[in-house]
């Protein structure tokens, strides 16, 4: 049972810690030459998994949780030329997108998700660094452990964001100095800059971090005054669709939200929750448990018209999901497949089966789903697979008719998993992957 701590004045106190330009800062922490110059970290779809030769792809799962997906990576050294540049019919083409840009690069107009070729036109002197997800996961894991040693209650919200509850541990007049001290310690220990927001409400603390960036600390003492003229798009969770919906009611600021309580209550639970978060009246606490609810993988590639090659790629991606499912020992009962075609056309299929998970079952269900999809006279450019709805491997919850056979296949899958964990993810492949 969680015990709610409050300070002597009876109010709660939250910190929101956000690592500044995390991937770029992580690269700078291991390479001094990248400091104080415009840089960006770039990435592109990892198509090595479709290589018919062994690629020695490994799984990075040290920092797994509901907030972050597992990363499949290769030990192969990446350079700008080898990673971002493709040669097509004698012409070189720069591929990939910006994952994170340093503040120096942002001043040139470089933004997240921008094509790297476009970013280099805006900032020709910018250094582009290939992504190194194992580094980011390990750093995030270490920083999380560091937070736990300095704050009584910590929630990891994403790979580069943390909430801390210091209620009853620090008084209001002490918390700003504590945040500054914590910020300095993280920089000294990890060479990583962070920004920190402080508030009596959890989600206002997160909003305050945006006011603190870069490398600052911002404390919200009067929530009503702080949100009064804040645009609704600034609040986490209010996307473009909801902004449009609010605009229809002439709501453009968070102060306007506060004045429309009845409207939000009419939208039931989602509206009531959002109203509480925006106004700081939600009384939401820290969540220290983070359970994964789904596992997925997607890949984007050049146009493919060959249906057999698309199916082969689905089976290869399935092996990667199987590896993760077996590694964290869950039993998914819902399977999802989406095929993205040219010109923005997408076709998807979902299947739910109350059976014990195994490699044989999952691949056979995917083959069935792919065959049932209405295939268009267009080339495929993206595949997405995921599994969800985890259940216990128990006869009471799963199909009795198939339980014994499925259990046998599950044990076989575990034996294959042991080999893959020892010798690599691609040590054993099925015929439909070749």
Residues covered by each model-derived region:
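Long, highly charged, low-complexity intrinsically disordered interaction regions
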Residues: 174-231, 394
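Short Gly/Ser/Thr- and Asp/Glu-enriched loop/turn motifs at secondary-structure junctions
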Residues: 157-161, 199-202, 330-334, 378-382
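Catalytic palm subdomain of template-directed nucleic-acid polymerases
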Residues: 164-183, 250
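Acidic, metal-coordinating catalytic segment for phosphate/diphosphate chemistry
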Residues: 351-434
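Residues that scaffold, gate, or flank divalent-cation-dependent active/transport sites
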Residues: 1-159, 163, 281
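DNA-contacting surface of Y-family translesion DNA polymerases
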Residues: 4-9, 16, 242-380
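A generic structural motif
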Residues: 161-166, 386
